[in-house]
């Protein structure tokens, strides 16, 4: 049996946290899934058995920070699954970890390996808590305590940049740096330190997620129209990019999965 819940953060945390999701699965046999880059970092707590990342032949840590990803991962269950995940707004994760999040790119960094006693204590308490509601309350209390130390002055400008990327199929570094009121060099550095990847790569990930969203809501759309709506140069460009991020062409992907955009849906 599988249950999946999306939980919205309290209003005060919404500028920093997109949502929480909780997955429980006691299905007999191995459950496997291919995950694609979402453009958002996350904080993951396993209360059940850990997942195995099969294409890297490694087990996920018990609790970990998932950095920005540049490609797909194949994950498989090793027993009963019980996961609680906090998904950050693209520009907000650095507030809670006090490090340049570029260091976390393409990595699952165990909470146990981070010099942050409060975060390690949170992981233990989430693991031992009676129910999911208590877990979410503990996680939100931790986030509130982090925010007591203030937020970076450039956070609003990065939020505006992300909003522009979300709403535009065509933009460039110069336009984004102008929105942020920074030089292109300053902008690229601050963007990467706070979002965990370069502006160019982030825009490519958002374009991938937009492609999934259009496919999700327009079953049977032609690939030429899809590439036009999502801002690719042409159909061959879209197919190349999609395969780079997912391991499949769009046609191969929809033959295996129902396309869903985590970024634009939740």
Segments from the language model and where they lie:
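Alpha-helical bundle regulatory/interaction domains
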Residues: 1-159, 163-174, 180-184, 198, ...
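Pre-recognition alpha-helix immediately N-terminal to the DNA-recognition helix
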Residues: 160-161, 207-210
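Long, low-complexity intrinsically disordered regions
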Residues: 188-193, 197-203
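A secondary-structure capping/hinge motif
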Residues: 194-197, 240-253
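Short Lys/Arg-enriched helix C-cap and helix-to-coil transition segments
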Residues: 203-204, 254-255
């Amino acid at each position: 049996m599988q249950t999946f819940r999306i939980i919205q953060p309290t209003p005060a945390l919404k500028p920093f946290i997109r949502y929480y999701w909780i997955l429980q699965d006691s299905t007999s046999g191995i459950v496997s899934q291919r995950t694609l880059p979402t453009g958002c970092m996350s904080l993951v707590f396993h209360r059940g058995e850990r997942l195995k990342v099969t294409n890297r032949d490694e087990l996920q840590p018990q609790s970990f920070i998932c950095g920005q990803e540049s490609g797909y991962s194949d994950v498989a269950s090793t027993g009963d699954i019980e996961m609680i995940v906090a998904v950050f707004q693209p520009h907000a994760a650095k507030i809670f970890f006090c490090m340049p999040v570029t260091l976390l790119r393409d990595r699952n960094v165990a909470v146990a390996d981070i010099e942050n006693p409060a975060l390690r204590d949170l992981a233990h308490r989430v693991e031992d808590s009676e129910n999911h509601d208590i877990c979410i309350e503990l996680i939100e209390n931790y986030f509130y305590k982090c925010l007591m130390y203030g937020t970076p002055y450039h956070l609003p400008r990065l939020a505006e940049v992300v909003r522009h990327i979300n709403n535009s199929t065509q933009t460039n570094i110069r336009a984004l740096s102008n929105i942020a009121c920074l030089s292109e060099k300053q902008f690229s550095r601050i963007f990467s330190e706070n979002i965990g990847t370069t502006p160019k790569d982030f825009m490519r990930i958002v374009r991938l997620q937009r492609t999934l969203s259009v496919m999700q809501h327009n079953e049977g759309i032609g690939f030429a129209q899809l590439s036009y709506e999502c801002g690719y140069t042409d159909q061959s460009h879209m197919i190349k990019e999609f395969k780079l991020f997912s391991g499949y062409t769009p046609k191969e992907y929809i033959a295996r999965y129902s396309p869903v955009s985590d970024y634009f849906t939740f």
